[in-house]
Design a protein with these regions (language model features):
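A nucleotide-sugar donor-handling region in carbohydrate enzymes
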Residues: 1-54
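Active-site regions of enzymes building and remodeling cell-envelope glycoconjugates
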Residues: 16-27, 87-96, 147-149
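A donor-sugar binding/catalytic signature common to diverse glycosyltransferases
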Residues: 97-141
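Donor-nucleotide binding loops and adjacent catalytic segments primarily
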Residues: 33-108
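C-terminal alpha-helical cap of glycosyltransferases
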Residues: 158-162, 171-192
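Short loop/helix-cap segments at secondary-structure boundaries that form the rim of catalytic
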Residues: 10-19, 81-90, 121
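Nucleotide-sugar donor-binding patch of glycosyltransferase catalytic domains
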Residues: 91, 123-163
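Hydrophobic/aromatic beta-strand patches that form the interior of the parallel beta-sheet core
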Residues: 5-8, 19-21, 76, 91-93, ...
């Protein structure tokens, strides 16, 4: 039997039984101030998120290179389980299961161009820079949609300083709400 609906968490046009509800992003009940306290962020904070593999190590290397220009800020790294090393003047949170909260607490996000991370930054209005893995077409497309290319890594310090001046602009992605409405309506119609 064909299913009633296929729910896809991306923007786009519905067709037949396919419902595109928009991104589904985790939410937090804590305020930004509570989260900053929870993570001990006391200065303006630049979050560097490199994903779960070593593919994003180039971002950390670049941040280490430009560190002297960023000395007045707190630099925090979120990485996969494979990167457990300690860095001087950089806080390495390692692997976290609440990246959305760390993104919300940060003042600027520097990240690979993964779709979920982009959506979480938009949800919480965190100014962000997305550098794709070179040759990874999906990340390159995602980054380009946000106005970035791999070569932007060469002006990362300049971009970070620009982004620190940007106002937060949260955008409720709404996907979870739309998906739950479709499911509730389906359950209600099958109970009658």
């Amino acid at each position: 039997k064909k299913c009633d609906y296929v729910i896809i968490p991306e923007d786009g046009v519905d067709e037949d039984n396919i419902r595109r509800v928009g991104p589904i992003v985790r939410k937090t009940k804590q305020s930004r101030e509570e989260l900053r306290e929870k993570f001990s962020f006391t200065k303006k904070t630049i979050l560097v998120a490199i994903g779960g593999t070593d593919a994003g190590l180039f971002l950390i290397e670049k941040v280490l290179e430009i560190l002297p220009k960023l000395s007045e800020f707190e630099i925090v790294i979120v990485s996969g389980p494979s990167l457990s090393k300690k860095f001087e003047k950089i806080k390495n949170l390692g692997f976290v299961n609440n990246l959305h909260e760390v993104i919300y607490a940060a003042d600027v996000l520097v990240s690979l161009a993964g779709k979920s991370t982009i959506d979480e930054a938009k949800q919480y209005g965190t100014p962000a820079i997305f550098i794709p893995i070179r040759g990874h077409f999906e990340q390159e497309d995602n980054a380009q949609e946000e106005g970035f290319v791999f070569e932007d890594i060469e002006r990362l310090d300049e971009l970070i300083l620009q982004k620190l001046e940007e106002k937060r602009n949260p955008h409720d992605m709404g996907g979870a709400q739309k998906a739950s409405e479709i499911i509730k309506n389906l359950l209600n119609s099958s109970n009658h």
